[in-house]
Amino acid sequence: MAFPTAEELTALIAPVVATRHLDVEGLRVTKAGPKSTVAIKLDSDSRPDLDLLEVVSQEIGELFDAAEARGELSFGAGYLLEVSTPGVDMPLTQPRHWRRNRTRLVSLDVDGKKRIARIGALNAEETAVILIERNKKALSVTVLELANSPRAVVEIEFAKPAQDELDLAGRTFDEAVEETDH
């Protein structure tokens, strides 16, 4: 039996991560004999802490061991299991990524130009998100359709965000859209 693929392992761990209300954001298999690695990136709306990641890592390890004992998987000479969160450099590609990063700054690559905006609310259908930008002293609100979203990554912010930006990011999608109409 061959070393399991990322797709096979993702399907196998799906029930375990679902019971913990986690999403698999990535699973990478690196085959290197006894130094093979299975790296799993998990996230959730409530930001998993280290204690939860430790519990889930234990559960996944036991699941892999049991499947290997039954002959359903073969890791060969062994493997290292890494379970972590994706980190801030993960591109925002799904509506849940935008929802989880509400009020944070995001860097967007629009027509080859870098654009920085604060993430506001998603609409009810989770197909569009509010972006808040500061132009000198004034704030502007734009609606970004996620289907046409450029590459976007969360920006690390060292200074405390301006309160007016946070207030606007905290409004509902419809309230923020109304703000642009005035």
Swiss-Prot record:
It is found in: Cytoplasm. Keywords: Cytoplasm, Ribosome biogenesis. InterPro entries: Ribosome_maturation_RimP, RimP_C, RimP_N, RimP_N_sf. GO terms for cellular component: cytosol. The keyword Magnesium does not apply. One of its GO terms (biological process) is translation. HAMAP family: RimP (MF_01077). Belongs to the RimP family. Required for maturation of 30S ribosomal subunits. This is Ribosome maturation factor RimP. It comes from Corynebacterium efficiens (strain DSM 44549 / YS-314 / AJ 12310 / JCM 11189 / NBRC 100395). The lineage of its organism: Bacteria, Bacillati, Actinomycetota, Actinomycetes, Mycobacteriales. The gene is rimP.
